[in-house]
C-alpha cells in the first residue's frame, strides 16, 4: 500500500511534469497540491523525574506545511505528571575553597567580597554582617545603569526572543570601575561582566539599491539580512514571542511582522516597493571574554539538565536563555518604511527610481549632538504622495506605507507610524521625539553571538557532559527547523521556512505558490517568457559517520529532485574534526 509520503511525492512529480509541459505551451498553471505538516510518531516517555514528578516525550518533523497546507504549529515535546518511589537527588552544591565564602544558594565568592555593601551573592547572604561594610567606592553611592544591567542578551539562532538573560549584572567583583553616563548625566559603576560600555550617538539611514518589482524580492532580502543561521539557510522560528530578556516594554519590529504584512499586500494593480531603513545608535557594549558571572537561576537550570540527553529538556533551556548570548552588541532604535508604489502612476508621471528613493528618505542626521530630520524635498517630490483614505482617483504614487519601529517608547513609536502612514513622509518633530525616547527604551539593534554553553562554569559537576549535550542540542535544533524539509520552488524561486510553513519567494517575473507562472506585467509586456534556471533545494544532512582514523567524520546530503535541470549551490559533503 502506498504511504502518504510516497503518494505526495508522486503527485508532486506529476505536477512538475505538467508544469514543464504547460510552460512550453505558455498556459497558466495550477498551484501544486498542498502539503500538510507531517510529524514523526511520539517517542517513548522518559523515566519519571523524581524531583519534579514529571516525564516527557518528543517528536520530530518530516515535512513542513507548504502550498497553503497546514503549518507545523504544534509542540515537539510534552510533559505529564507521574509518580515514582525514587527519592529526589538534588545536584550537589559546589565545593568552595578555603579562601571562598559560600552563599546560601551554593555559589562561591571570594571572602574579601563579604560585608562590602555589594550584593555579591544574589540571595544577599554575604551582607549578613555585624561590623560596618567596607565599600569599594568608599563614600560614593554609585549604581549601574539600565544599559549595563541588560548587557549580554540571549539570541536564538532561529530568530525568536529568549525570555531571560543568563547573566547577573549586579555583580562587581569588588571593583569600583566608574564611567560617565551622558544619558543620566551622572557617574555610574560598570558591572564586572561588562568589559566596555561606550556611549556614542550614530545616525544611519539607507535606502535599498533597487526598487523591488514584487514583495517577495523584498522579503527575501529582509530574511537574508536577519539570518544568523548558516546551515539552515532561510529557516526561522519566531513563535508567539515572549517578553524580551531586556526587561520592560520594547517596541519591536520583528522579521515575522515584515514578512506577514509585506507578503499580505495583494492587489491586481502593478506595484513596486521601496524600503527605507534608519537606525539611531547611542551605546555599545562588549562582554568580558572569560570569568563571566552567570545568574543563580541560570546555574540551577543547568544543574537540572539531565546527564542523559533529552531533546525536550535541552530545547526548553534554549527557548528560555537562547542558543547564544551577545558578546558584543549595540543599543538604540531602528525603523523600516516599506512603500507600496503604484507602478501605473509612476509610469504616467515619468518618475525614475532615483527620484523615488530620494523623495522617500527621512533625511535624518546628527547636528551638534542633536538628532534632526533635515531632508529638503525639491519640487520633483510634490507628486510623490500617499493616497488619502477614501480617495479613489488612484493618482497617488504611494498606495500604502508599512511602518516597522524597534526601540523607543510606545507613544512615540505609534505617533511615528501614524504620521508616516497618513502623510507618506516623516515629520521632523515626531522623528526627534521618537529618537530621544530611545535612551529610556533601547532595543538591541546589533549583536555578535557566542554559544550559550561557553558560559557554563566548567568546575561544576557534570559540566562537560551538559556542554556536549548543548552542542548537540543546538545542532538538532537547527536540523529540526530546517528548510531541507521543504519542496523546491520553480523558475529561480527561493525557499524560506517561517514559523512552520515553507514559502516560495518568487522572482519579479513569476508568481504562484511555487512560482510556476509567468507574470508579463513584471517585465516589458512584449518580451517572450525568459528561460530561468530552477534552484534545487538541499535535502537534510545524513547523520555523522563514526570518527575515522584521520580524526574526521563525514556526512552527506542530496539535491532535492523533482525539477528538471535544477541544481543546488554548496557542497554535498560535510566534514569536521572529531
Language-model segments: residues:
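Thrombospondin type-1
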Residues: 2-100, 104-106, 111, 123-138, ...
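Short, surface-exposed loop/turn motifs at beta-strand boundaries within globular domains
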Residues: 38-41, 52, 225-229, 482, ...
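Beta-strand secondary-structure signal
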Residues: 56-58, 231-233, 361, 503, ...
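Short coil/turn segments at secondary-structure boundaries
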Residues: 71-73, 125-127, 261-265, 377-381, ...
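Short Cys/His-rich zinc-binding micro-motifs
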Residues: 109-115, 489-496, 503-507
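Acidic, glycine-anchored loop motifs typical of Ca2+
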Residues: 117-121
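Membrane-permeabilization and membrane-interfacing ectodomains
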Residues: 132-491, 496
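Conserved HRD-motif arginine in the catalytic loop of eukaryotic-like protein kinases
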Residues: 512
Amino acid at each position: 500500500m502506498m504511504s502518504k509520503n510516497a503518494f505526495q511525492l508522486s503527485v508532486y512529480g506529476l505536477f512538475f511534469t505538467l508544469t514543464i509541459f504547460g510552460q512550453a505551451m505558455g498556459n497558466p498553471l495550477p498551484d501544486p497540491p498542498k502539503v500538510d505538516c507531517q510529524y514523526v510518531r511520539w517517542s517513548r516517555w522518559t523515566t519519571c523525574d523524581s524531583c519534579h514528578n514529571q516525564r516527557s516525550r518528543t517528536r520530530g518533523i518530516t515535512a513542513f506545511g507548504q502550498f497553503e497546507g497546514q503549518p507545523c504549529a504544534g509542540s515537539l515535546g510534552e510533559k505529564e505528571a507521574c509518580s515514582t518511589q525514587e527519592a529526589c537527588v538534588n545536584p550537589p552544591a559546589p565545593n568552595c575553597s578555603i579562601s571562598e565564602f559560600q552563599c546560601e544558594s551554593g555559589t562561591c565568592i571570594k571572602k574579601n567580597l563579604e560585608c562590602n555593601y555589594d550584593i555579591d551573592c544574589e540571595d544577599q547572604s554575604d551582607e549578613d554582617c555585624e561590623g560596618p561594610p567596607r565599600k569599594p567606592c568608599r563614600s560614593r553611592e554609585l549604581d549601574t545603569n539600565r544599559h549595563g544591567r541588560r548587557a549580554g542578551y540571549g539570541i536564538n539562532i532561529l530568530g525568536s526572543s529568549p525570555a531571560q538573560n543568563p547573566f547577573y549584572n549586579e555583580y562587581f567583583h569588588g571593583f569600583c570601575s566608574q564611567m560617565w553616563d551622558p544619558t543620566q548625566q551622572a557617574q555610574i559603576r560598570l558591572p564586572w561582566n561588562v568589559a566596555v560600555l561606550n556611549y556614542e550617538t550614530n545616525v544611519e539611514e539607507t535606502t535599498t539599491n533597487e526598487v523591488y518589482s514584487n514583495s517577495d524580492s523584498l522579503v527575501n532580502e529582509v530574511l537574508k539580512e536577519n539570518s544568523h543561521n548558516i546551515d539552515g539557510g532561510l529557516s526561522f522560528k519566531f513563535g508567539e514571542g515572549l517578553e524580551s530578556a531586556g526587561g520592560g516594554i520594547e517596541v519591536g519590529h520583528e522579521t515575522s511582522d515584515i514578512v506577514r504584512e509585506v507578503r499580505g499586500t495583494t492587489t491586481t494593480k502593478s506595484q513596486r516597493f521601496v524600503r527605507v531603513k534608519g537606525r539611531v545608535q547611542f551605546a555599545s557594549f562588549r562582554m568580558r571574554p572569560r570569568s563571566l558571572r552567570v545568574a543563580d537561576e541560570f546555574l540551577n537550570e543547568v544543574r537540572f539538565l539531565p546527564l542523559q540527553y533529552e531533546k525536550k529538556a535541552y530545547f526548553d533551556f534554549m527557548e528560555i536563555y537562547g542558543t547564544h548570548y551577545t558578546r558584543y552588541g549595540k543599543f538604540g532604535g531602528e525603523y523600516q518604511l516599506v512603500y507600496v508604489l503604484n507602478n501605473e502612476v509612476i509610469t504616467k508621471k515619468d518618475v525614475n527610481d532615483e527620484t523615488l528613493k530620494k523623495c522617500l528618505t527621512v533625511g535624518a542626521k546628527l547636528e551638534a549632538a542633536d538628532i534632526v530630520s533635515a531632508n529638503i524635498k525639491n519640487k520633483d517630490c510634490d507628486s510623490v504622495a500617499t493616497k488619502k483614505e477614501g480617495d479613489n482617483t488612484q493618482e497617488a504614487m504611494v498606495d500604502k506605507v508599512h511602518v516597522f519601529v524597534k526601540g523607543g517608547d510606545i507613544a512615540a513609536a505609534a505617533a511615528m507610524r501614524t504620521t508616516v502612514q497618513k502623510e507618506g513622509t516623516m515629520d521632523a518633530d515626531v522623528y526627534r521625539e521618537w529618537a530621544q525616547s530611545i535612551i529610556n527604551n533601547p532595543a538591541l539593534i546589533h549583536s555578535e553571538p557566542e554559544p550559550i554553553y561557553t558560559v557554563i562554569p566548567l568546575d561544576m559537576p557534570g559540566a562537560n557532559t551538559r556542554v556536549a549535550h548543548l552542542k548537540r542540542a543546538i545542532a538538532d535544533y537547527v536540523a529540526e527547523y530546517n528548510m531541507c524539509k521543504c519542496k523546491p520552488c520553480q523558475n529561480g524561486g527561493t525557499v524560506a521556512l517561517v514559523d512552520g510553513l515553507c514559502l516560495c519567494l518568487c522572482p519579479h517575473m513569476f508568481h504562484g505558490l511555487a512560482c510556476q507562472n509567468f507574470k508579463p506585467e513584471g517585465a516589458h509586456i512584449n518580451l517572450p517568457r525568459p528561460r530561468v534556471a530552477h534552484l534545487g533545494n538541499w535535502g537534510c544532512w545524513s547523520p555523522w559517520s563514526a570518527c575515522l582514523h584521520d580524526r574526521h567524520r563525514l556526512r552527506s546530503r542530496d539535491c532535492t529532485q523533482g525539477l528538471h535541470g535544477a541544481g543546488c549551490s554548496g557542497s554535498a559533503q560535510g566534514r569536521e574534526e572529531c
